[in-house]
Amino acid sequence: MAMANHRIDRVGMEIKREVNDILQKKVRDPRVQGVTITEVQMQGDLSLAKVYYTIMSDLASDNQKAQTGLEKATGTIKRELGKQLTMYKIPDLVFEKDNSIAYGNKIDQLLRDLDNKS
Protein backbone atom coordinates (compact mmCIF):
# COMPACT_ATOMS: atom_id res chain seq x y z
CA MET A 1 0.00 0.00 0.00
CA ALA A 2 2.80 2.43 0.89
CA MET A 3 4.40 1.70 -2.47
CA ALA A 4 1.17 2.68 -4.25
CA ASN A 5 1.00 5.98 -2.35
CA HIS A 6 4.61 6.66 -3.21
CA ARG A 7 3.86 6.14 -6.91
CA ILE A 8 0.80 8.42 -6.74
CA ASP A 9 2.91 11.17 -5.13
CA ARG A 10 5.69 10.68 -7.66
CA VAL A 11 3.29 10.88 -10.61
CA GLY A 12 1.74 14.03 -9.12
CA MET A 13 5.15 15.69 -8.72
CA GLU A 14 6.11 14.71 -12.27
CA ILE A 15 2.87 16.12 -13.69
CA LYS A 16 3.35 19.35 -11.71
CA ARG A 17 6.84 19.81 -13.15
CA GLU A 18 5.80 18.95 -16.70
CA VAL A 19 2.66 21.13 -16.71
CA ASN A 20 4.67 24.15 -15.50
CA ASP A 21 7.16 23.45 -18.29
CA ILE A 22 4.44 23.00 -20.93
CA LEU A 23 2.70 26.24 -19.88
CA GLN A 24 5.97 28.15 -20.30
CA LYS A 25 7.14 26.58 -23.56
CA LYS A 26 4.18 25.19 -25.50
CA VAL A 27 1.04 27.17 -24.62
CA ARG A 28 0.94 30.52 -26.38
CA ASP A 29 -2.32 31.71 -24.81
CA PRO A 30 -1.71 35.07 -23.06
CA ARG A 31 -4.39 34.19 -20.51
CA VAL A 32 -2.11 31.59 -18.92
CA GLN A 33 0.99 33.78 -18.68
CA GLY A 34 1.90 34.24 -15.05
CA VAL A 35 0.16 30.99 -14.04
CA THR A 36 2.19 28.74 -11.75
CA ILE A 37 1.21 25.19 -10.85
CA THR A 38 1.53 24.83 -7.07
CA GLU A 39 0.29 21.29 -6.45
CA VAL A 40 -1.14 18.25 -8.19
CA GLN A 41 -3.38 15.83 -6.31
CA MET A 42 -3.79 12.46 -7.99
CA GLN A 43 -6.81 10.23 -7.66
CA GLY A 44 -5.85 6.78 -6.33
CA ASP A 45 -6.26 5.05 -9.71
CA LEU A 46 -4.30 7.84 -11.49
CA SER A 47 -7.27 8.58 -13.77
CA LEU A 48 -7.69 12.17 -12.55
CA ALA A 49 -5.25 14.91 -11.59
CA LYS A 50 -6.45 17.99 -9.72
CA VAL A 51 -4.03 20.70 -10.76
CA TYR A 52 -3.85 23.69 -8.41
CA TYR A 53 -2.48 26.97 -9.74
CA THR A 54 -1.79 30.53 -8.66
CA ILE A 55 -1.72 33.69 -10.72
CA MET A 56 0.11 36.93 -9.98
CA SER A 57 -3.02 39.08 -10.26
CA ASP A 58 -5.71 39.37 -7.60
CA LEU A 59 -8.31 40.58 -10.11
CA ALA A 60 -11.31 38.27 -10.42
CA SER A 61 -11.41 38.92 -14.18
CA ASP A 62 -7.78 37.78 -14.55
CA ASN A 63 -8.50 34.68 -12.48
CA GLN A 64 -11.45 33.86 -14.73
CA LYS A 65 -9.34 34.41 -17.85
CA ALA A 66 -6.60 32.13 -16.48
CA GLN A 67 -9.15 29.42 -15.66
CA THR A 68 -10.65 29.67 -19.17
CA GLY A 69 -7.19 29.66 -20.76
CA LEU A 70 -6.17 26.57 -18.80
CA GLU A 71 -9.38 24.77 -19.74
CA LYS A 72 -8.82 25.65 -23.41
CA ALA A 73 -5.20 24.42 -23.21
CA THR A 74 -6.08 21.12 -21.50
CA GLY A 75 -5.93 19.13 -24.77
CA THR A 76 -2.50 20.52 -25.64
CA ILE A 77 -1.24 19.93 -22.10
CA LYS A 78 -2.48 16.31 -22.09
CA ARG A 79 -0.93 15.67 -25.51
CA GLU A 80 2.43 17.07 -24.36
CA LEU A 81 2.22 15.06 -21.11
CA GLY A 82 1.69 11.97 -23.24
CA LYS A 83 5.00 12.65 -24.99
CA GLN A 84 6.88 13.27 -21.72
CA LEU A 85 5.47 10.70 -19.30
CA THR A 86 5.79 6.94 -19.54
CA MET A 87 2.24 6.18 -18.45
CA TYR A 88 -0.30 3.90 -20.06
CA LYS A 89 -3.06 6.51 -19.76
CA ILE A 90 -2.58 10.21 -19.12
CA PRO A 91 -4.99 11.33 -16.37
CA ASP A 92 -7.78 13.80 -16.99
CA LEU A 93 -6.80 17.25 -15.75
CA VAL A 94 -9.00 19.50 -13.63
CA PHE A 95 -7.63 22.97 -12.92
CA GLU A 96 -8.48 24.72 -9.64
CA LYS A 97 -7.27 28.04 -8.28
CA ASP A 98 -5.01 27.55 -5.26
CA ASN A 99 -6.23 30.05 -2.68
CA SER A 100 -3.85 28.92 0.07
CA ILE A 101 -1.21 31.56 -0.76
CA ALA A 102 -3.76 34.39 -0.81
CA TYR A 103 -5.21 33.01 2.43
CA GLY A 104 -1.74 32.92 4.01
CA ASN A 105 -1.07 36.49 2.88
CA LYS A 106 -4.37 37.62 4.40
CA ILE A 107 -3.48 36.00 7.73
CA ASP A 108 -0.03 37.64 7.61
CA GLN A 109 -1.70 41.01 7.01
CA LEU A 110 -4.14 40.46 9.90
CA LEU A 111 -1.25 39.56 12.21
CA ARG A 112 0.68 42.67 11.12
CA ASP A 113 -2.42 44.80 11.74
CA LEU A 114 -2.78 43.32 15.23
CA ASP A 115 0.91 43.91 15.88
CA ASN A 116 0.63 47.56 14.81
CA LYS A 117 -2.30 48.14 17.17
CA SER A 118 -0.50 46.84 20.24
From Swiss-Prot:
One of its GO terms (cellular component) is cytosol. The keyword Cytoplasm applies. Keywords: Cytoplasm, Ribosome biogenesis. Its main location: cytoplasm. InterPro entries: KH_dom-like_a/b, RbfA, RbfA_dom_sf, Ribosome-bd_factorA_CS. It is found in: Cytoplasm. PROSITE patterns: RBFA. The keyword Cytoplasm applies. Pfam families: RBFA. Disulfide bonds: none annotated. One of several proteins that assist in the late maturation steps of the functional core of the 30S ribosomal subunit. Associates with free 30S ribosomal subunits (but not with 30S subunits that are part of 70S ribosomes or polysomes). Required for efficient processing of 16S rRNA. May interact with the 5'-terminal helix region of 16S rRNA. Belongs to the RbfA family. Monomer. Binds 30S ribosomal subunits, but not 50S ribosomal subunits or 70S ribosomes. This is Ribosome-binding factor A. It comes from Streptococcus pyogenes serotype M1. The gene is rbfA.
